Amino acid sequence: MRKPYLNPRIFQQRRQKLASLIPGAAVVLPAWPEAIRNHDGHFPYRQESSLLYLAGFDEPGACLVFRPGMKPETVMFVRPKNVERETWDGFRYGVDGAKQEFGFDEVYSIDEFEKVAPTLLKDCQKVYYSLYRNRETQ
């Protein structure tokens, strides 16, 4: 399994700094979509900056829900493992790998986002989200 490029504790410290600034709120950070170059090729992937800074997770199709002071505090949604797609698109951590390597409190498949996210956000006083940055996740 591929290791994260930095120690996950660095990202935990960054999230702790943010937590002190937004008590009772949540942050939702979706990954940037992949940019298609032509019908069967993509441009090199670049993660959304805030997600990369706070989670260190560099795969497309992901979303971080960060809820400071709540249980679970860090919930990551990722693309599931798929050996066939990995042959063409490259390595994927999947649900188990993301939890093991990055230390998120909970990890779900991105396919479960619409079902799980409302329950995660219902008790939050505010939700921070960048509007109009990613049409796929609006």
Where is each model-derived feature located?
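A composition/biophysics-driven feature that prefers long, compositionally simple stretches
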Residues: M1-Q138
